[in-house]
From Swiss-Prot:
It is found in: Cell membrane. GO terms for biological process: phospholipid biosynthetic process. Belongs to the GPAT/DAPAT family. The keyword Cell membrane applies. A motif (HXXXXD motif) lies at residues 123-128. It is a peripheral membrane protein. This is Putative acyltransferase plsB1. Keywords: Acyltransferase, Cell membrane, Membrane, Transferase. SUPFAM superfamilies: Glycerol-3-phosphate (1)-acyltransferase. It comes from Mycobacterium tuberculosis (strain ATCC 25618 / H37Rv).
Length: 621
């Protein structure tokens, strides 16, 4: 047995496995309060007995197994351990100054006095799980227990972390029904005890910088508890954590090129701790509008059309609120400008892209991290210097003026930072492409609102696994608003001449489609091209993705794609997910599979051509 396994299951579990100690089915003096309460609860024992009958197993065997899982996952809050952990957390966070909105904290304190708070946070760093609990305590909110992956429960840190509120849960539990039962019961007991909670709604760290689709497990267990227990409201608190820069990003981007992820262990922790000795700016902690879970469930169930999908809809709502709470960092807009150009720029050229973008962000009433002035030359220069110091950006200053560009093999790192703000820009980018497509395809010289809408909905469908879009009705409303922001459009509900649509795009203060969507469409183009060329009856996903990486490198060298960031395993996997959703991967025996794969490739090639047209229009401005 490895040190990692000992750290995860504990010495007592090890002694049980070798037969020295039996698992106690009654409370122990060392058990956390929730473990004692559950082992003494009649309802818990009755449901365990029913589960044993369902599984055809001996009840005592199931009870012992359940008690072991319960002790494995249950956390406590030992005052001395917590104080020591807080000191360790602050030391590990020393690369950053943490900024928290005081007004948001004041509102949370009011809710904290009367309700349970469940913080669903965006997850970009291992540091998130330390930053949020520390901020909760530092700002005089009730302590929170944090759900985390069992991969972080390694020796010797796991046992300490459990005494500071860390709940380590296994990821793969499909074949462990007793474990799933125990986790559900434990979550219910926590809600019953009005314990504040935190967890990553994404289920793991994003590898791209933008929010991943929500994982429903913890939210489902909390919802089940709310359904069963009469008590105070549980507020889901959308929580955004974003950083100026992160030491971890470079390691994540190597995984995007196909490298194997390193395991979390003591060596990992030492490496992470050493990295934090280099200052990287600020970390920004922001909270979206809290969602009253019990009330929201009642509202949804009152509408019969909403029953059966409550968890999914609430999770998406929470993620939308996280996005809305996420501020734009100067690092994100500088990365956007440099990646879009894919060449070195003077500071004046960077500002030429950033200033109209800043005006657009202001028009959307979106917060800028630290209230930074994105139009200020000093702000942009300082950001460039910080990115040079971390190696993401290179500078050449031996000529007549300094020019900055993305460093060698740093495109995915810069893309990660850009993507922290990309959710703000996606609807605008889609609107630009939809207008262009409608103007291109008109047969009578007129562009109807319905055509623009349909083109936008087609793009939304193409990118639905990549970005978090609003529901259709809200999306159409947002689309109309984006068209109004592009230029002098009086009424988006009336047809317009195609020539006027072209002029609208040509005269726009800023065009974003090429800056926002081109990297993703280029990656999709690689996947679609390779899929159209695929002739084998069987489909080897690992081999296919490896081929995409190789062809992606070729296309990068040939300039068939605009940037190296499109050569990403993460983007390829999402494109393949879309293809599988369209039944273009499996079922290769279908008679029309080759035709439909080619149509898919043509669809993406057309979208890519149009985004390059937008890039050309932007270049002429």
């Amino acid at each position: 047995m490895t040190a990692r396994e000992v750290g995860r299951i504990g010495l007592r579990k090890l002694l049980q496995r070798i037969g020295i100690v039996a698992e106690s089915m009654t409370p122990l003096a060392t058990d956390p309060v929730e473990v004692t309460q559950l082992l003494d609860a009649r309802w818990y024992d009755e449901r365990l007995r029913a589960l044993a009958d369902e599984l055809g197993r001996d009840p005592d065997s199931v009870r012992a197994e359940a008690a072991g899982y319960l002790r494995e996952m249950a956390a406590s809050l030992d005052e001395r351990a917590v104080q020591a952990w807080r000191g360790f957390s602050r030391w590990l966070m020393r690369a950053y100054d943490v900024l928290v909105d005081e007004d948001q904290i004041t509102q949370l304190r009011k809710l904290d006095r009367k309700a349970t708070l469940a913080f669903a946070f965006s997850h970009r760093s291992y540091l998130d799980g330390m930053l949020l609990p520390e901020a909760i305590l530092a700002n005089r909110l009730s302590p929170a227990l944090t759900f985390g992956g069992a991969n972080l429960n390694f020796f010797p840190m796991g046992a300490w972390a459990k005494r500071t509120g860390a709940i380590f849960i296994r990821r793969q539990t499909k074949d462990i029904p007793v474990y799933r039962f125990v986790l559900r019961a434990y979550a219910a007991q926590l809600v019953q005890n009005h314990v504040n909670l935190t967890w990553s709604i994404e289920g793991g760290r994003t590898r791209t910088g933008k929010l991943r689709p929500p994982v429903f497990g913890i939210l489902r267990y909390i919802t089940d508890a709310v359904d069963e227990i009469d008590g105070p409201e549980v507020y889901l608190v959308p929580t955004s954590i974003v950083y100026d820069q992160l030491h971890e990003v470079e390691a994540m981007t190597t995984e995007a090129y196909g490298a194997v992820k390193r395991p979390e262990d003591l060596r990992f922790l030492v490496r992470l701790a050493r990295q934090q000795g280099e200052r990287l700016g600020r970390a920004y902690l922001d909270f979206g509008e809290p969602l009253p879970l019990r009330k929201r469930l009642q509202e949804m169930r009152a509408d019969k059309s909403g029953t059966g999908s409550e968890i999914e809809r609430i999770a998406l709502d929470v993620e939308h609120r996280i996005n809305r709470a996420t501020p734009v960092t100067p690092t994100a807009v500088v990365s956007l400008a440099l990646l879009g150009a894919d060449r070195s720029l003077s500071i004046s050229e960077v500002l030429a892209t950033v200033r109209p973008l800043a005006s657009y962000i202001a028009a959307r009433n979106w917060a800028v991290a630290g209230a930074a002035d994105l139009t200020n030359r000093s702000t942009i220069r300082w950001t460039l210097h910080q990115m040079v110091a971390s190696g993401v950006v290179s500078v050449y200053d031996a000529g007549t003026e300094a020019v900055w560009g993305i460093g060698e093999d740093q495109h995915l790192v810069a893309a990660f930072y850009r993507n922290t703000a990309i959710h703000i820009l996606v609807d605008r980018a889609v609107a630009e492409l939809a207008l262009l497509a409608a103007a291109e395809t008109t047969t009578n010289g007129s562009v109807s609102p319905a055509t623009v809408r349909d083109e936008a909905l087609s793009l939304r469908d193409l990118l639905k696994f990549e970005f978090l879009f609003s529901g259709r009705a809200q999306f159409e409303k947002d689309l109309a608003n984006e068209v109004l922001l592009i230029g002098s459009v009086v009424d988006t509900s009336k047809p317009a001449a195609a020539a006027d649509v072209w002029r609208l795009l040509e005269s726009a203060d800023v065009l974003l489609a090429h800056l926002v969507l081109r990297p993703f469409l280029d990656a999709y183009h690689i996947v679609a091209d390779r899929l159209a060329a695929h002739e084998d009856d069987s489909f080897d996903e690992e081999g296919f993705l490896a081929e995409c990486l190789q062809v992606g490198k070729q296309w990068e060298l040939q300039r068939n794609i605009a940037s190296a960031e499109s050569r990403s395993m993460e983007l390829f996997k999402t494109a393949l997910r879309l293809a599988r959703h369209r039944e273009l991967v499996d079922g290769a025996d279908a008679t029309d599979i080759a035709k439909r794969r080619q149509q898919f490739a043509d669809e993406i090639a057309t979208a890519t051509r149009r985004v390059n047209t937008i890039a050309e229009l932007a270049r002429r401005q």
